[in-house]
């Protein structure tokens, strides 16, 4: 029996191999849950530098497990990967990166997947701390501002998607949740406080980080927003 809703799991690949979670991949496949998983590069060195030693090998084994269950080849089990740059630059063209990923992962590991989504590094949280520590914050923000692309604005995920926290908090996007920019009308707003009829036309809470989604080809949970 499958779930009655289209469910997407923003999956940490390595958790699929952790003790106590051995049945998670099979559970997701049985319920036809779409998987979107981060793999910052198809190179072991780059992934391990960004995520820690051993993460690349564990991610590859997890992807091979998902492939054995039908993910990436069975139309009912979509498997998408997410790329974000390992540095202070914008993602390259999504279609070209997807072709490279598919060729490299198939050739070296026999892995197949459906789509690759490119996401810009947002100047918040740990990445903001890294930028400030190395004196690169102002230069990176200047890059985002200079790369503003008005063609991305209509497709911004904050204009058609809500983010709901685990306690019911309502945010305009994932990044606003990380910054605790919760909806407020005299106080915090929760999912059960919201009248759907009042959502359309509501002002979106914005900040400097929003230029990350409008730069270059754009960025969203579904990848690039505009053609290169």
Residue ranges of model-derived segments:
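A generic local structural motif
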Residues: 20-24, 197-199
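Radical SAM enzyme [4Fe-4S]-AdoMet core and its adjacent flexible, acidic
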Residues: 43-157
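Short secondary-structure boundary/capping segments
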Residues: 26-27, 154, 202
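Core AdoMet radical
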Residues: 1-20, 27-63, 80
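Flexible mid-to-C-terminal extensions adjoining Fe-S/redox cofactors in radical SAM and related proteins
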Residues: 169-228
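C-terminal accessory regions of radical SAM enzymes
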Residues: 145-176
């Amino acid at each position: 029996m499958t779930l009655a809703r289209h469910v997407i799991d923003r999956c940490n690949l390595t958790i699929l191999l952790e003790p106590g979670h051995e049945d998670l991949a099979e559970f997701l496949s049985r319920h036809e849950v779409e998987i979107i998983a981060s793999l910052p590069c198809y190179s072991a060195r780059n992934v391990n530098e960004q995520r820690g030693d051993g993460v690349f090998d564990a991610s590859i084994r997890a992807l091979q497990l998902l492939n054995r269950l039908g993910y990436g080849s069975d139309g009912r089990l979509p498997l998408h990967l997410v790329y974000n740059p390992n540095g202070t630059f914008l993602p390259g063209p999504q279609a070209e990166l997807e072709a490279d990923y598919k060729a490299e992962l198939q050739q070296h590991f026999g892995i197949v997947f459906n789509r690759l989504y490119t996401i810009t590094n947002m100047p918040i949280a740990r990445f903001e701390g890294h930028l400030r520590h190395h004196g690169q914050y102002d230069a990176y923000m200047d890059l985002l501002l200079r790369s503003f692309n008005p063609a991305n604005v209509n497709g911004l995920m904050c204009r058609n998607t809500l983010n709901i926290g685990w306690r019911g908090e309502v945010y305009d996007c994932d990044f606003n949740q990380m910054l605790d920019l919760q909806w407020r009308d005299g106080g915090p707003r929760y999912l059960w406080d919201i009248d759907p009829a009042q959502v359309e036309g509501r002002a979106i809470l914005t900040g400097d980080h929003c230029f990350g989604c409008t730069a270059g080809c754009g960025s969203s949970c579904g990848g690039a927003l505009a053609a290169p």
